[in-house]
Design a protein with these regions (language model features):
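Short catalytic/signature loops enriched in Gly
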Residues: 3, 142-146, 238-353, 359
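P-loop NTP-binding/switch modules centered on Walker-like glycine-rich loops
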Residues: 56, 177-181, 185-267
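Conserved ABC transporter NBD signature motif
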Residues: 63-75
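Conserved ABC ATPase "signature" region
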Residues: 74-75, 127-146, 255-256
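Conserved ABC ATPase signature
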Residues: 150-155, 159
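A short, proline-enriched helix->beta-strand linker immediately N-terminal to the Walker B motif
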Residues: 170-174
């Protein structure tokens, strides 16, 4: 497969009265034609900001953007706004998490669909409406000839999200960004929407970036997964690598907090302790160390880079523990062992790390 999107060392900072918000801090990833990349993380991890920046939607908002976002051979970071408008909603489209607030309540859905069509295509009003009916049928809305003349409040939550998908696909984009598209929906409708996206991807050949806080949502949908924390990617790999052999304590926490049908009835979910850090005054060393059950003194001063797991560049993690020790800890967690017991294993077997050029040493918190 050929590369469609290449994000390199992307940094997005916002100037506020309280200081500089480091929303995205040097992330890199790529998406191939027809591929699905899932970006997972808690609220405030930077996953949505990175995608909004891809669409040029952070421009003029006290934002400083550096790095590159190369889409189809053009760097979107430096692209003039008039050229960006020809890409936004056309070659790259986005679905937002709340369809009710994304759709205008005073306009019929057909009018909103035809507006999306006419923005990038020179077609007649009748041809645009005919296309709108086709789009509603394509996303599984029954009786599209009648429903194209209805208002958003006349649709259920799941049907409104289907309308948003239809609008995003109006111009057959090469890349679809779906930002928490199932958050406001019940579990059954979530599965229907994800199945619809996968079906449309197979039919149209587009790439998808799915943004979510729930690893359970992406289990059978992702080709690759990037886990974000505090503006950085802390682990990335294939779906099998992330679910079967995760290598970062934050990923472990996300996985252990997912409800599973095969979990014993008396086994409780394990929440991730603490809260995400301030992106203005970030922790020294590993940004996850204040919440990590396996933190050692070295982790509070050394900032770990993403490094290949067992030499595999397709699976990387930003953790100072050895791959062997991380693997043993995860196997213990998967078998139901307590974090306290596994922490004892880490303390006993981890060796102090020398500071080298491959590790960033931080002496104090960001000012």
């Amino acid at each position: 497969m050929s590369r469609l999107l290449e994000v390199s060392d992307l940094r997005v900072e916002f100037s506020t009265e309280d200081g500089i918000v480091h929303a995205v801090d040097g992330i890199s990833y790529g998406v191939d034609i027809g591929q699905t990349l899932c970006i997972v993380g808690e609220s405030g991890s930077g996953k949505s900001v990175s995608s909004l920046t891809t669409l040029g939607l952070t421009r003029g908002r006290n934002a400083s953007v550096s790095g590159s976002i190369v889409f189809d051979g053009r760097d979107l970071v430096t692209l003039p706004e008039d050229e960006m408008r020809s890409i936004r909603g056309n070659q790259i489209a986005m679905i937002f998490q709340d369809p009710l607030s994304s759709l205008h309540p005073f306009y019929k859905v057909g009018a909103q669909l035809t507006e999306a069509i006419n923005t990038h295509q020179s077609v007649s009003r009748s041809a645009a409406k005919e296309r709108a009916v086709e789009l509603l049928a394509m996303v599984g809305i029954p009786d599209p000839q009648r429903r194209v003349d209805q208002y958003p409040h006349e649709f259920s939550g799941g049907m409104r999200q289907r309308v948003m998908i239809a609008m995003a696909l109006a111009n057959e984009p090469k890349l679809l960004i779906a930002d928490e598209p199932t958050t406001a929906l019940d579990v059954t409708v979530q599965a229907q929407i994800l199945a619809l996206l996968q079906e449309l991807q197979d039919r149209l050949g587009m790439a998808i970036i799915l943004i979510t806080h729930d690893l359970g949502v992406v289990a059978e949908f992702a080709d690759e997964i990037s886990v974000m924390y505090a503006g950085r990617i802390v682990e990335r790999g294939s779906d099998k690598q992330i679910f079967l052999a995760p290598q970062h304590p934050y990923t472990w926490g996300l996985l252990k907090s997912i409800p599973r049908l095969d979990t014993p009835r008396n086994e409780e979910l394990v929440p991730i302790s603490g809260r995400p850090p301030s992106l203005i005054q970030r922790p020294t060393g590993c940004h996850f160390h204040p919440r990590c059950p396996y933190v050692l003194d070295d982790h509070k001063r050394i900032d770990p880079p993403l490094t290949p797991v067992d030499g595999d560049p397709g699976h990387e993690a930003a953790c100072l523990l050895s791959t062997e020790l991380r693997t043993r800890v995860w196997k213990g967690l998967a078998a139901g062992e307590e974090s306290a017991q596994l922490r004892h294993l880490v303390v006993e077997e981890a060796r102090p790390l020398p500071v080298s050029g491959s590790h960033r040493l931080t002496q104090e918190a960001d000012q």
